[in-house]
């Protein structure tokens, strides 16, 4: 059975929305009057991005500032284990990775050059700096996703293997963010913090 591109995006939307395990009220996204009507690709994809932003910003705010340098170690899981944890990102590193990835992926979606502020985002250390940078990266991402139109949503992006259209790349960027969101939730729990999505 062949699945259309729009069906694939719809299925991905459902899968990603379900990944958080929480019912959310994302105001100003979909309304009852939208049911059964075509929706612009940018609007549909932006809903996914809004959901991710809500989840990521929630965990970023929930972690105490003094725990931003936390990273799991072998001792966290199995003392004496031969597993190597030397390259595991800290909580701060996970968040700056998401911010940097937002700039990278969404600049490819639109063809825009990322702003100068994106260059040093991975070097930020404090909670306040990281929260501000993360928020800016999501604002940039929302602006770039709005460049997706019915006409260009599935046009090939030259030189980009794997995720080669604006729509599929935008969807992948959200999926990538949820991968790291899941890790951030575990970091919170390892530090006795209940993730906002579980309240």
How should each PLM-predicted stretch be described?
Residues 1-5:
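Positively charged n-region of N-terminal signal peptides that target proteins for export
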Residues 7-18:
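Bacterial N-terminal signal peptides
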Residues 23-26, 65, 114, 143, ...:
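Low-complexity, Gly/Pro
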Residues 23-30, 34, 42, 46, ...:
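Short, contiguous alpha-helical
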Residues 36-41, 126:
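Electrostatic cytochrome c docking/interface patches
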Residues 48, 122-157, 166-180:
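Acidic/histidine-rich alpha-helical segments that form the ligand environment
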Residues 52, 59, 101, 134-137, ...:
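Amphipathic alpha-helices that form helix-helix packing interfaces
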């Amino acid at each position: 059975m062949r699945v259309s591109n729009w069906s694939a995006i719809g299925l991905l939307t459902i899968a990603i929305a379900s990944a958080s395990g929480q019912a959310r009220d994302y105001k100003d996204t979909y309304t009852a009057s939208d049911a059964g009507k075509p929706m612009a690709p940018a609007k549909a994809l932006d809903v996914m991005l809004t959901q991710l932003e809500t989840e990521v910003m929630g965990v970023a705010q929930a972690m105490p500032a003094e725990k931003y340098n936390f990273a799991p170690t072998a001792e966290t899981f199995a003392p004496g284990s031969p597993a190597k944890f030397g390259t595991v990102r800290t909580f701060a590193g996970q968040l700056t990775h998401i911010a940097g990835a937002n700039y990278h992926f969404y600049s490819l979606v639109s063809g825009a050059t990322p702003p100068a502020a994106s260059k040093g985002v991975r070097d930020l250390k404090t909670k306040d700096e990281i929260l501000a940078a993360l928020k800016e990266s999501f604002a940039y991402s929302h602006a770039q996703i709005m460049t997706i139109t019915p006409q260009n949503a599935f046009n090939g992006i030259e030189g980009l293997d794997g995720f080669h259209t604006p729509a599929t790349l935008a969807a992948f960027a959200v999926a990538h963010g949820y991968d790291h969101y899941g890790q951030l939730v575990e970091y919170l729990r390892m530090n006795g913090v209940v993730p906002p999505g579980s309240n």
